[in-house]
Structures are given as C-alpha cells and as structure tokens.
C-alpha cells in the first residue's frame, strides 16, 4: 500500500497542474494582454467618413479603397497567429441617395451568410505580424455569393470592417477583435456622391487613368487652330497621301473628305494623330484664289515629294517631236531637285526599265491626273513639231486664257500613260 499511495498522490498533482494550465490559457498569456490594433491612414479614412464613404460591389468582386491596414503590437513573437477580417452591419437601415445626401430608405434585407476573409499570410509568427502593418489589399467585395475569398455584401447597406487575431498552433482561441468606426461605408454598385469619386481619384494611384481620360476628353473638345500650319506638310493627289518626310506611296486607306477622322496605319498613327480629329480641306478653291494657285501648287508639291533617297527623277524618253509645257514660278528659294517643267513627247510615253504600264515606284497615273489645280503660269503657246496620236490635231496653239488651259490640259492628260519610277 505504501507503494501505491505515492502514485495516487502524483496523479492528483498532474491533474491539478493540467487544470491550472487550461484555466491560464483561457485567461490569456501575460505577453498577450497588451495587444493593440491601430488603424493606418486614419486621417484619410476620416475624410471619407465625413462624406459618407462608398465602396463598389460587383459580381466578380472589387477591391477596397482606401485599403484597410492596421498595425499590431503585443503579440508573442514566437507564437503562431492568424488574422481574419469580416464585415458587420453598422445599423438596421437600407440607405438611398436623395438630393445629394444619404438618407434611410426602409428596412434592411436579411443579412447574407457570414463571410470571413483569412489573410493570405496566415498562419504566421507574431514577429511577422508586428514587423509591418497588416494590409487587406486583396480582399474583394461582391454582391454575389461566389466564394474564392470574396466578401458578399448587400448593396445600399452600411457596413463596418472588423479585424480578428486568432492564436493557432495548439488550442485555437480568439485573443483580439477590433473595429474602427471611421472605416464604415455604404456598399454601392456605382458611386453616388461625386465628392467621393473625386476624393478616390485624387488619392488612389490606380484611379489616375480615369483622371487622364477625362483630361484627354477635355482637350479633344478644344478646337485646334493650328490646322493650317499642319496642313502644309501634307499633299493629297488623287488617291495618294504624301507625307513631307517619308517614302512616297499610296495611303493604307482612301482619303476621307466627309470630316470623319482618318485612321492610317504604320508609323503615321502617332506622328499625324492631330490630323485625325481636325482635318482641313485638302485642296484650296482655285476659283477664289486663282492668282496664287500656281505658287501654292508648286509649294505643296515640292514639299510633299520625298527626298532623292526614296524617289529619283522621272525618266521620260526624249524625242525630236516634243512639245513642252514650261511652268515657272516666282519662288527663287525653292531648292527641290524636281524642276517645274513637264515634257510631253510626241509619241506614246513608255516607262524606262520596265514593261509598259507597270508600276515600279508606287506612282500611278492618279498622280498626274489627280490634281484639279489651274495652271495659270503656263506659257502662252504650245508648239508641236510633229503630229501625234496623243494630241488633238486642231491644237497647235493655246491662248493665255485660263479656260483654254484647263480644257487643253484635260484633253492632254486623258491620253497620258503611266509614268514609271526608275533608279
């Protein structure tokens, strides 16, 4: 009996110690009695609180702004904890936005099933949670029960977030739970208060795109008065779009003259973006500006033609029976390598270095026939030394009248063959 009595006394002591340990764990460890949660960005949250904060809820979920962040102190650095977040109703009202303010609008809907968001870093050591503010930047608010870490909320109801800290690694127990009144918000499917929208755009770096888009739309409404200066760098000849500093070639789409924006491809999309929205008339009226038509045509044509590295001079075979259309201009500062002289042979024009009628340099007969400009600077006569099928037999001399020049040139250009570009 003397041997059994010590064993009985030992069992009694062990059970008493275990009981005391359990009671101590329920009361909390001494190192966890001073746990504190403090809200980060409290000043910003207060600004939203004064305007009645709103949070967007969508079917797929929308992240919160401001982001809920809190600093934790008083945890055991070597113990394991999980941090959770849930949302509770802040009142028993359904809200509506009337005349610029939120007012109660009836009884609330039944509360949705309680959804708890577990921080993705959970579980972790107390040292981890205390080294930096705990951020709930990935939580998403939804108006549908989708799961996947989303919190379901009823639209037009006011909520208040709560942060919970649970100790894990043994017997799980809640050691802290705290909410912050300044983080209350009304769940909405679209912002109702414009001041809330402006405040979120101002402070949310991910909302700057909305502000930039608004500024771009405002700039588009301002008329562009520099169209005349921009127009001087472009020339429209028939179906051709000729930039002043690029290779000559047809445009990717035919020119539009109905005021619609021009959408060109390639490198011209950004360089000539201003031409899309404010496009001036491609040609001046030769009836109202007849005195300056010749000079304008030469200025535009010489400015639009590409440099010698992308387009060589026109190669037209010489012939003894050749009539010349001498065109002169008063501009002496023009340094273009293409003189204002068009030579028309007495026989059929044949492209040099290629088959007849082929297009080698991207230049078609539209370049010669596309312009409707009047040639007031042409010489007074066109001597023709030999008859040709290209000329009207009755055309031996052309007067200085503008109407005669226009009708004669129309008959001449109708029989011109395509001129090929050779290198």
Curated annotation (Swiss-Prot):
- Bias class Polar residues marks the residues at 290-304
Q: What is the documented disruption phenotype for this protein?
A: Loss of notochord cells and posterior structures. Disrupts left-right development.
Where is the signal peptide, in residue numbers?
A: none
Any one GO molecular function term: DNA binding
Q: Where is this region: Disordered?
A: 215-234, 280-304
Residue spans with biased composition (Basic and acidic residues)?
Answer: 215-227
Q: In which tissues is it expressed?
A: First expressed at the dorsal side of the blastula embryo. Expressed in the germ ring, shield and chordamesoderm during gastrulation and is restricted to the notochord and tailbud during somitogenesis (at protein level).
Report the locations given in the UniProt record: Nucleus
| Family annotation (SMART domains) | TBOX
Where's the DNA-binding part?
44-212
Q: What domain of life does the UniProt record list for this protein's source?
A: Eukaryota
User: What processes does the entry annotate via GO biological process terms?
Assistant: cell fate specification; convergent extension involved in axis elongation; convergent extension involved in nephron morphogenesis; determination of heart left/right asymmetry; determination of left/right asymmetry in diencephalon; determination of left/right asymmetry in lateral mesoderm; determination of left/right symmetry; digestive tract development
Q: Per UniProt, which keywords does this protein have?
A: Activator, Developmental protein, DNA-binding, Nucleus, Transcription, Transcription regulation, Wnt signaling pathway
Gene Ontology cellular component list:
chromatin; nucleus
Manganese listed as a keyword = no
- Which Gene3D superfamilies does the record cross-reference, listed alphabetically? Transcription factor, T-box
Q: What biological function has been recorded for the protein in this entry?
A: Involved in the transcriptional regulation of genes required for mesoderm differentiation, including itself. Indispensable for the formation of the notochord and the tail structure. Functions together with tbx16/spadetail in development of trunk and tail mesoderm. Functions by itself early in development to repress medial floor plate and promote notochord fate but at later times, functions together with tbx16/spadetail to promote medial floor plate formation. Acts in a parallel pathway to, but cooperates with, non-canonical wnt-signaling during tail formation.
**Protein name (database record):** T-box transcription factor T-A
User: Which taxonomic lineage is given here?
Assistant: Eukaryota, Metazoa, Chordata, Craniata, Vertebrata
What gene name is listed for this protein? Answer: tbxta
């Amino acid at each position: 009996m003397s041997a059994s009595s010590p064993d009985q006394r030992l069992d009694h002591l062990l059970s008493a110690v275990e009981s005391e340990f359990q009671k101590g764990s329920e009361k909390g460890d001494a190192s966890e009695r001073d746990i504190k949660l403090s809200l980060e960005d409290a000043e910003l949250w207060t600004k939203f609180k004064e305007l009645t904060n709103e949070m967007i809820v969508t079917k797929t979920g929308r992240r919160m702004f401001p982001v809920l962040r809190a600093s934790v102190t008083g945890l055991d650095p070597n113990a394991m904890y999980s941090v959770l977040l849930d949302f509770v109703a802040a009142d028993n009202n359904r809200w509506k936005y009337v005349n610029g303010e939120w007012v109660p609008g009836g009884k609330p809907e039944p509360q949705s099933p309680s959804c708890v968001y577990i921080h993705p870093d959970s579980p972790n050591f107390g040292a981890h949670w205390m080294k930096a503010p705990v951020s709930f930047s990935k939580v998403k608010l939804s108006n549908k029960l989708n799961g996947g870490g989303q919190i379901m909320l009823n639209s037009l109801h006011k909520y208040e977030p709560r942060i919970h800290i649970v100790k894990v690694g043994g017997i799980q127990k809640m050691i802290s739970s705290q909410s912050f009144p300044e983080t209350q918000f009304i769940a909405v499917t679209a912002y109702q208060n414009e001041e809330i929208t402006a405040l979120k755009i101002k402070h949310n770096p991910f909302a700057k795109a909305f502000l930039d888009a608004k500024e771009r739309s405002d700039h588009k409404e301002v008329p562009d008065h520099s169209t005349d200066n921009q127009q001087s760098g472009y020339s429209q000849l028939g179906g051709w779009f000729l930039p002043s500093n690029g290779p000559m070639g047809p445009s990717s789409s035919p020119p539009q003259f109905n005021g619609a924006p021009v959408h060109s491809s390639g490198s011209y999309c950004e360089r000539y973006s201003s031409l899309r929205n404010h496009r001036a008339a491609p040609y001046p009226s030769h009836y109202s500006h007849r005195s300056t038509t010749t000079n304008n045509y030469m200025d535009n044509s010489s400015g639009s033609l590409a440099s010698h590295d992308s387009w060589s001079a026109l190669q037209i075979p010489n012939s003894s029976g050749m009539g010349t259309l001498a065109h002169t201009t008063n501009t002496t500062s023009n340094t273009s390598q293409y003189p204002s002289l068009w030579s028309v042979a007495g026989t059929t024009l044949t492209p040099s270095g290629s088959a007849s009628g082929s297009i080698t340099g991207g230049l078609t007969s539209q370049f010669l026939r596309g312009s409707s400009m009047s040639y007031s600077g042409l010489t007074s006569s066109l001597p023709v030394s030999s008859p040709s099928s290209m000329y009207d037999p009755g055309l031996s001399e052309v007067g200085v009248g503008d109407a005669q020049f226009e009708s004669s040139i129309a008959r001449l250009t109708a029989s011109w063959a395509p001129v090929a570009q050779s290198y």
